[in-house]
Design a protein with these regions (language model features):
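Context-gated lysine
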Residues: 13-17, 35-37, 69, 100, ...
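Domain-exit/linker segments immediately C-terminal to small folded modules
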Residues: 47-132
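N-terminal cysteine/histidine-rich coordination modules
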Residues: 1-77
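C-terminal, charged low-complexity interaction regions
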Residues: 133-213
């Protein structure tokens, strides 16, 4: 079941202490209203009743979207995730057939949700993003891009956002024809080789491209 607890939060602006609901695990079928609040950040946004300041709180939690068989563990503090990886890697339980992921930041978690909502496979998206990274480093190193994220705008158009020091500096449209070409030509082989992989990120993409050729 979903697990949460009230914790005392100190406002970063005025210093007032206020109770805030912190989630250890979220199950969307038990809390349907939380699904949208996760996506618009309100599930994790602290609002100070004293001064009106707001802040997005980053902490570790497990996200369970049961209706789509998705489990994502968010290691927002960047700590060791080996214990959670061992748990998620277990077989022969109710989570067989799930898409299980471990991400190391809140932004990476939000990206996984956007990819899920768009109906794409995050492994193929990550492989495409890896080639985008290669192009950026070969031709635009002076731009000092340090993050690239999949995103969807208000019109439903998918793309990649390029960030530097936390600020968006550029974007490009997502090539759905390339996605389809990779899916059609390599999905079965990719799925057979990586079905149980938990960490689907840039390092994973570089490794799997080298392995699969």
């Amino acid at each position: 079941m979903s697990q949460s607890a009230m914790q005392e939060i100190t406002c970063p602006k005025c210093g007032k202490k206020t109770s805030f609901l912190v989630w250890a695990s979220i199950i969307t079928m038990e809390n349907p209203e939380i699904k949208e609040k996760v996506r618009n950040d309100e599930a994790f946004r602290f609002h100070c009743p004293e001064c009106g300041a707001s802040a997005l709180l980053n902490y570790n939690f497990l996200y369970h979207q049961q209706e789509d068989k998705v489990l994502i563990y968010v290691s927002a503090d960047g700590g060791d995730t080996s214990d959670m990886a061992q748990i998620l890697d277990q077989r022969g339980n109710a989570f067989d057939g799930y898409r299980k992921r471990i991400v190391r930041s809140y932004n990476a978690f939000k990206e996984k949700l956007l990819i899920l909502d768009a109906g794409f496979d995050d492994r193929i998206v990550e492989i495409i993003k890896s080639s985008v990274w290669d192009n950026v480093e070969a031709h635009y190193k002076d731009k000092k891009i340090d993050e690239i994220y999949f995103a969807t705008n208000d019109d439903g158009v998918h793309g990649f956002l390029f960030r530097r020091a936390g600020e968006m500096v550029a974007s490009m449209e997502f090539d759905e024809s390339l996605y389809k070409a990779i899916y059609d030509s390599a999905y079965e082989r990719l799925d057979a080789a990586t079905k149980n992989d938990l960490y689907i990120d840039r390092d994973w993409a570089k490794d799997v491209v080298e392995r699969m050729g």
